[in-house]
């Protein structure tokens, strides 16, 4: 868990900050006034772009049911999904992969405060500061430290959380030369040549 999926440069596993503890979850829900007489219900929207999205949404729904929370899955086409998340429309959470991250700041355009795509709708300029510090820092060790601090901050505030990236595979044989792996972000074969 974190703001970037495992395998992305400077990834830090922050799962320990949000351990799976159903008893504690039920207690927190009770403290917030939710229980059998007043269950917490939320909308979990996803789209039809990839078949794995509705599977992930179903897993989340089942996990929520274990702590007596109801997740109502709303499955829509990709265009409807985009139009909905870009507005203050009826959704609470969504499942999407947006793009496989190449760096921590690949998705800054959807999580900085001035962004029209600020999906968490937060106003915390510390997020902007983290991105700026990360982008300016050239020392790999200092950059990694900023990334760790930012991921821990984001998990604490729950501004953005990623459980995993979507399954995406590309295969290149050893005889395929000049192939560059860019995750799911871009797939280029225009400079590739075959070494016979």
Please tell me what each predicted stretch does.
Residues 22-43:
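Immediate post-signal peptide segment of exported/extracytoplasmic ligand-binding proteins
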């Amino acid at each position: 868990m974190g703001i970037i999926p495992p395998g992305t440069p400077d990834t830090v596993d922050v799962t320990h900050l949000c351990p799976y503890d159903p008893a504690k979850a039920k207690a927190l829900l009770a403290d917030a006034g939710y229980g059998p007489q007043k269950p917490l219900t939320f909308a979990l929207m996803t789209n039809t772009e990839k078949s794995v999205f509705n599977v992930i949404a179903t897993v989340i729904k089942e996990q929520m049911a274990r702590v007596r929370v109801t997740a109502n899955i709303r499955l829509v086409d990709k265009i409807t999904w985009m139009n909905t998340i870009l507005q203050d429309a009826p959704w609470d959470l969504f499942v999407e992969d947006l793009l496989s991250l190449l760096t921590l700041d690949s998705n800054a355009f959807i999580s900085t405060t001035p962004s029209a795509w600020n999906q968490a709708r937060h106003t915390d300029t510390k997020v902007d500061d983290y991105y700026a510090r990360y982008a300016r820092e050239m020392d790999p060790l200092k950059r990694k430290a900023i990334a760790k601090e930012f991921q821990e901050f984001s998990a604490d505030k729950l501004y953005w959380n990623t459980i995993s990236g979507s399954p995406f595979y590309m295969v290149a044989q050893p005889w395929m030369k000049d192939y560059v792996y860019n995750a799911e972000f871009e797939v280029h074969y225009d400079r590739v040549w075959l070494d016979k």
